[in-house]
Amino acid sequence: MRRFPKLTVMVAALGLTFGLSGCGKGGSSSSQSSTATSTPAATAAPAKPVHVYPKGTPIKLAFVSNNVANYWNFAHAGVRAFEKKTGIQVTFREPAKGTVAEQNQIIEDLVTEGYNGIAISVIAPNDQIRTLDSAARSLNLICVDSDAPKSSRLMYIGTMNYNAGLLMGKEIVKLLPKGGQVAIFVGNLAARNAYRRLDGIEHVIKGHNITIVAKKEDNQDYARARSNAENVISAFPHLSLMCGLYSYNGALAASAVKAAGDKGKIKVIAFDQDPDTLQDIKTGLINATVVQNPFMEGYLSCKYLRNICANGMKAVPTPANVDTGVQIVDAKNLVVYEKKLAKMMASK
């Protein structure tokens, strides 16, 4: 496939500020929310490749998720909103099984197909540096949702996951004022978004008589996620709360609680706006969920990539992070939040 001419330069990791704000926070005034301030991105190398294309060059952009989940439908809606506004088509690809091998192959294929920019949610940051760095030598690479700060990616867009964990930890303390036993459920703790959320939770619950008795990974296997929840309920008869760090974990934990007849006895806190999660908040099976803004992750990642391709590091903010924000959704503000979601999805 014909590659268009480009100017590739090596630049310092932090460039001039590009003025673009993140999303606003939704929900009612009673909801807790957190929009973190930007923090400097850690980098392994003093310089990173950026690729600037001549004016008029047709730009090929791609968005790569880390698995197939409802969460990415909202990001896809953001990508489509960008397409409608700019007329630039963006390829949206998802690794069907959520494996590193699949995602690496997608990256390599996009390079071969002559793409100019990729926004990617990295599955295992420390294990994929070689693949990411190789791609960055041929195209503009940014991370979204799950970061790989030691790679040659140019910037990160998404949740500041440690701060999201702090918010979740505060909600856990609120739900367990006398303390108790907590179990953590997650797809893959090697993913930076997952372990940073857990770091935040562990920081907040210290000194509150709250003990994490289990940390269960499922590798994006829903059947395994459900059995993990069932096994923990059986193993810990005094379990107080189940905490899901991936979008599907909360609802699957709640279904296990319901099956065990422990509704009300075992509290559940989730992550993200999965439809089953929101339904379980309505029925009282889930107490609260920490929601991100995947719509803005999709939209902003495309917008920044487009501008980087045209203007180089002048389009990268300083620090090289854009926080899309998080908030707590519970029974009090659920109706308002669902209206906000419906408006977002109308863009797809």
Spell out what each predicted region is.
Residues Y71-I88, A164-M168, R192-T211, R224, ...:
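Short, solvent-exposed amphipathic alpha-helices that sit
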Residues Q103, I157-V182, R224-R226, Q273-T277, ...:
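Hydrophobic alpha-helical segments within soluble ligand-binding/sensing domains
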Residues K84-K97, Q181-I184, I205-Y222:
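Short beta-strand elements in bilobed, periplasmic/extracellular small-molecule ligand-binding domains
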Residues P125-N163, L167, K174, Q181, ...:
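Flexible loop/hinge segments that line or gate small-molecule binding clefts
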Residues V111, A119-A136, I201, N219-D280:
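Hydrophobic alpha-helical
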Residues S21-S34:
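Bacterial lipoprotein signal-peptidase II cleavage site
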Residues P46-G78, F82-E83, T91-Q105, Y115, ...:
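Extracytoplasmic "Venus flytrap"
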Residues A36, P40-T57, L189, N193, ...:
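Hinge/cleft segment of the Venus flytrap/periplasmic-binding protein
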